């Protein structure tokens, strides 16, 4: 690369690393918030520990499966769109979860006791399992983006820095939801979903603006040695990858 191209590549590389770090941290905002809201849901809604534990178990199982499924899908799609849309959908699932009491009350009528409680628990369970699946849209596109933008010889070092996004996201949501529950009391559990969801939805918009799928998307050459700089056509001849936006 010439000096100008190298500067542009460095800029986009840094931008991609920072954007994906922030984005992946926000996936934790709309997953780890559940545990912090649990005491409030027990007190305010009367949901049992058994139901809440079942939500967590199913969420974890579906999340594990979804990482495999989403990994396959992310390899075949634009990683920029995949990550941004996935985070936005996680945020919407959290918004819906926070409105579960209102949804069940509106559909079945307020104050009807057991039926409303069952409907609310079912709605919450569906939303949290759905969120578990959508959480799997976080890491696979990051892995794809980073391997396109970081040379193999730098990958271990820069991935070590990137991996702090897990701890940053989990730590910040503890502070945020801890403050919310301390300030609003048991009834503040809803805001443990609404506020992280609002932040994450805004973050999804930032991801869509900040990320680009590959270096060729911005007129830069692919990194040598990754195999991405060439592809085979029908005649098995090597040619440069076409530019993608």
Can you say where each PLM-predicted feature lies in the sequence?
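Helix-to-loop junctions at the C-terminal end of transmembrane segments
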Residues: 66-78
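C-terminal ends and interior cores of transmembrane alpha-helices
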Residues: 88-117
């Amino acid at each position: 690369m010439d000096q100008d191209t190298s500067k542009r590549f460095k800029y986009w590389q840094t931008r991609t690393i920072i954007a994906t770090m922030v984005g992946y941290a926000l996936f934790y905002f709309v997953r780890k918030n559940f545990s912090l809201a649990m005491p409030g849901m027990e007190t305010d809604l009367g949901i049992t520990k058994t139901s809440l534990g079942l939500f967590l178990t199913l969420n974890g199982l579906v999340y594990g499966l979804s990482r495999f499924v989403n990994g396959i899908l992310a390899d075949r799609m634009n990683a920029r769109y995949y990550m941004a849309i996935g985070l936005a959908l996680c945020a919407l699932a959290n918004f819906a979860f926070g409105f579960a009491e209102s949804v069940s009350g509106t559909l079945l009528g307020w104050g009807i006791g057991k039926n409303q409680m069952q409907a609310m628990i079912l709605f919450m369970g569906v939303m949290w399992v759905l969120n578990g699946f959508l959480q799997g849209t976080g890491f696979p596109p990051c892995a794809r983006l980073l391997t396109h933008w970081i040379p193999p010889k730098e990958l271990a070092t820069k991935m070590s820095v990137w991996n702090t996004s897990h701890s940053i996201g989990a730590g910040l949501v503890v502070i945020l939801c801890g403050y919310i529950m301390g300030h609003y009391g048991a009834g503040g559990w809803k805001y443990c979903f609404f506020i992280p969801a609002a932040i994450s939805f805004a973050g999804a918009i930032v991801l869509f603006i900040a990320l680009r799928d590959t270096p060729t998307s911005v007129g830069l050459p692919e990194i040598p040695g990754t195999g991405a700089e060439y592809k085979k056509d029908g005649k098995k001849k090597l040619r440069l990858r076409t530019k993608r936006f």
